[in-house]
């Protein structure tokens, strides 16, 4: 985040400025801006205003961090019995193996806090705040490869196409800000990693929800979102005029086909203009 510089800060500052005062816009533009304001709030009172969700793709196994499995060490080296495997198919990396030995963690675990949560010695600082954390260990998937497992974790299904958790948060919480996306995605590859984890846009996709809830990826540098700046030689007023004409064409299409996604696209274009 520290490398994002003025980019995100500039967008945040812009959200505090009256959008109608930023350059010359036509009457149609004003109407569209008022139409495509913040996302409507839900019909119930949300218990949270915002969600920061961190997903460490390719991070250490939970079996080495906080999911203590003493029997894995007790039976270390023993071939995995069929009663456990139950015909589970093999991965490409293990299909050539003759045996499938049980492997325990190489790290020591201790219990911490009043909750007596198990944490390994890999996380000495996290162990100091375990009573402020909730460990969910009941999730289960039959996926045996990273890609379908990660897709399941983000969308609740191994098959691509369903809304991501961030899109559901956007849908459930709404938005009080009409100048920034309600769902923002930041990617970080860390240091010293020659090949980052393959992360696909479907992991923050909106699925069958409106594209208003699609995650918007912010990049580092002066242009956190691509194509927001006016092209060279094109003024803000000229861009406003082009957007107005484009909106007229899209509105005609919406009247013909009745596809609500067309209105969502108009709203997204207007947000990009305000950003």
Residue ranges and their predicted role:
Residues 1-275:
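Ligand-binding pockets and gating/stacking loops
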